[in-house]
Regions:
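Short aromatic-enriched loop/helix-cap "lid" or pocket-rim segments at secondary-structure transitions
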Residues: 25-26, 33, 205-209, 251, ...
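Conserved SAM-binding loop
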Residues: 88-210, 219-232, 253, 317-319, ...
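Extended interfacial segments that mediate partner engagement and assembly in macromolecular machines
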Residues: 41-134, 139, 143-145, 208, ...
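Hydrophobic, well-ordered beta-alpha structural blocks that scaffold small-molecule cofactor pockets
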Residues: 89-90, 113, 252, 257-406
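General small-molecule cofactor/ligand-binding pocket signal
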Residues: 19, 143, 237-240, 352, ...
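Contiguous mid-protein beta-loop-alpha structural module that forms a pocket-lining wall or clamp
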Residues: 202-276
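N-terminal juxtadomain amphipathic helix
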Residues: 2-79, 240, 250-252
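Short, hinge-like loop/turn segments at secondary-structure boundaries
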Residues: 38, 140-144, 212-215, 256, ...
Length: 406
């Protein structure tokens, strides 16, 4: 791992030269599970921090076509108890016939929530063929395309401009923020609303959380997200954080009514500098943290305790890869039948069902919890009859984290 000056990368948010980076090694695409053990392609993961706007970012993103042409990340299987707050906000400021587009609508789950809330004029955009088909089957009109200025213009010609643009768990995936921002400007009416939800990068700094998913190429705090809004003529109305897949940050913005309406702000202030300093600290502490994680897990192994992962996902799998602890695991358990019987890419760790996994456990076992915090207590309660199980989480902000996080 090297922390160094970046010679040839510019920030994809503000365009400034990036000054500091950390090399986390080469890793596979974590959601590309294998039908049988095999060697897979690995990609470099170098992360840079911007001293000017505070955004930290993966420097060389994998081409989006590698992920999203045909992609199975159905949102309907995920519990999202935090959504009621956003739905309440939108219903309090928008009429039932307000024209709303959900960018990256996936299988249409949030569109369905909007429909259940009483909204009637709903459209989605989803680049993956299989997920967009599911949303269409649920009764929604969906544009099966990536969003850029050209497609935004086509959508506006077809549908007109929108009263509200929803962008949930999408902006962190976007490698061309300038083009995406211009497209959003095209879609929303003057005075219209923009709702954005992203993972909160403050969790990475505080956790610390080094489980970087290769699909998440941008890591926003409230300051860098507000910077994105203002660059695109959108003023921040409200923001809040929720427990979901770590911690997520939700903001509601409003497009300025006319170009002459000023958005005075100092783009590079103390808060963005603080974000950069947090990134530098996070970077320089990585090696020590990794060593402590490896020592802690191996200490269980050396005592004859079997080590098993529970929950194969886009946070847990990168954690194992980046920490270099795959060699300590016997197998992984996951409740999703689509994953069972397959193998983790790169490590070739077998994924089994709960019934199969529990039957394999003999004596004391360390269960590394790779499920989100909101699901931990339910899972532990269901396994409480096995007193020989030791539960330790690998995903902040859990209260059951490995000691290395302290």
């Amino acid at each position: 791992m090297n922390v160094n000056v970046v010679g040839h990368f510019s920030c994809r948010l503000c365009g400034s030269d990036l000054e500091t980076s950390v090399d986390l090694g080469e890793h596979p695409i974590v959601n590309r599970l294998s039908e049988k053990p095999r060697q897979v392609k690995k990609y470099p993961m170098q992360v840079g921090g911007c001293k000017q706007c505070g955004l930290f970012q993966i420097l060389e993103p994998i081409d989006a076509l590698e992920f999203y042409t045909n992609y199975d990340n159905g949102s309907s299987v995920k519990r999202e108890p935090h959504l009621h707050k956003l739905l309440d906000q939108l219903s309090s400021i928008l009429s039932a016939n307000a024209k709303i587009i959900d960018i990256g609508c996936n299988d249409g789950k949030f569109l369905s929530h909007l429909r259940e809330t009483g909204f009637t004029n709903l459209i989605g955009l989803e680049p993956t063929k299989n997920m967009s088909s599911v949303a269409v089957a649920s009764g929604f009109k969906v544009f099966n395309t990536f969003l850029d200025v050209s497609t935004a213009n086509e959508i506006v010609l077809s549908e007109g401009k929108f009263d509200c643009v929803v962008i949930r768990q999408v902006l962190e995936h976007i490698s061309n923020l300038e083009s995406f921002g211009l497209a959003i400007q095209q879609l929303v009416k003057p005075g219209g609303m923009i709702a954005i939800e992203v993972p909160d990068a403050q969790l990475n700094f505080r956790g610390p959380d080094y489980a970087l998913w290769e699909e998440h190429v941008n890591y926003f705090t409230i300051k860098s997200l507000e910077f994105f809004l203002r660059l695109n003529g959108i003023k921040l109305v409200s923001s809040y954080v929720s427990i979901f897949s770590g911690i997520c940050l939700t903001v509601l913005g409003q497009k300025i009514l006319q170009e002459s309406e000023a958005l005075d702000f100092e783009p590079f202030d103390n808060a963005t500098t603080d974000d950069f300093l947090s990134f530098k600290k996070w970077s320089t502490e990585f090696l020590t943290f990794k060593e402590n994680v490896r020592k802690e897990i191996k200490s269980f192994k050396e005592k004859g305790v079997e080590v098993v992962l529970y929950g194969v996902g886009s946070r847990s799998s990168p954690f194992l890869n980046i920490m270099g602890v795959n060699d300590t695991l016997s197998f992984a358990i996951d409740d999703d039948p689509r994953k069972q019987g397959k193998f983790l890419p790169g490590s070739n760790i077998e994924i089994v069902s709960r019934e199969d996994g529990v039957s394999r456990l003999n004596g004391q076992s360390l269960i590394l919890l790779g499920v989100n915090e909101e699901n931990e207590e339910k899972l532990i309660g269901e396994l409480s009859s096995r007193s020989s199980l030791i539960f330790k989480s690998i995903l902040p902000p859990s209260e059951r984290l490995l000691s290395a996080f302290n």
